[in-house]
Amino acid sequence: MQKLKQQVFEANMELPRYGLVTFTWGNVSAIDRERGLVVIKPSGVAYETMKADDMVVVDMSGNVVEGEYRPSSDTATHLELYRRYPSLGGIVHTHSTHATAWAQAGLAIPALGTTHADYFFGDIPCTRGLSKEEVQGEYELNTGKVIIETLGDAEPLHTPGIVVYQHGPFAWGKDAHDAVHNAVVMEEVAKMAWIARSINPQLNHIDSFLMNKHFMRKHGPNAYYGQK
């Protein structure tokens, strides 16, 4: 697990590097599906002092199997998503400014241009709000459930992120670094959408044929973007 702990540590350290977190407001995890174990950031530990050995290993029920610290308070959300979507290898949660603003506004981040379409096939959805009972019960688990309720049976890697109403963004990917990459992109397109709609409040969504082209040339069966 040491290799995965190092990867998760490095991915967590990318969050302050890209300006996605303030203080300790974020976490990254990754899963070893063969072993059924998840590595995640410890709760409330400052990035300035954090080390790879501080990462916490939990099983799929949330029991700590390795580590001196308590795991992130959002662990139950991560585990619920891993259980539901086998294609996920890494998950990120932040309170990055612009994506969180859309979450607090209760609005999906609209697909307005090709930067968005290169990574997200359509709007980045916003969940419904959690009920009082859901918050006072198993809050973090129910956060995962409301994300799943919103995504349904859609392929999560085609829309590798979501904003949870009145909370903030979650992003995911094939591994921890891919998840962070998608979280960075989500923050950037959230900022672009806010600026674009401020300039032109009547701005329409990107044309579907242009969105399809940009997404499929990177992620489709005949993708040709980048190098083999």
UniProtKB/Swiss-Prot annotation:
Binds 1 zinc ion per subunit. One of its GO terms (biological process) is L-ascorbic acid catabolic process. Zn(2+) binds at D74, H93, H95, H167. The active site is at D118, Y225. Pathway: Cofactor degradation; L-ascorbate degradation; D-xylulose 5-phosphate from L-ascorbate: step 4/4. It holds the Pfam family Aldolase_II. Induction: Induced by L-ascorbate. Repressed by UlaR. It comes from the Bacteria. Keywords: Carbohydrate metabolism, Isomerase, Metal-binding, Zinc. Substrate binds at G26, N27, S43, G44, S72, S73. It is an enzyme of class 5 (isomerase). GO terms for molecular function: aldehyde-lyase activity; L-ribulose-phosphate 4-epimerase activity; zinc ion binding. It catalyses: L-ribulose 5-phosphate = D-xylulose 5-phosphate. InterPro entries: Aldolase_class_II_sugar_metab, Aldolase_II/adducin_N, Aldolase_II/adducin_N_sf, UlaF. Its cofactor is Zn(2+). Signal peptide: none annotated. Its EC number is 5.1.3.4. GO terms for cellular component: cytosol. Belongs to the aldolase class II family. AraD/FucA subfamily. NCBIfam families: PRK08193.1, PRK12348.1. Catalyzes the isomerization of L-ribulose 5-phosphate to D-xylulose 5-phosphate. Is involved in the anaerobic L-ascorbate utilization. This is L-ribulose-5-phosphate 4-epimerase UlaF.
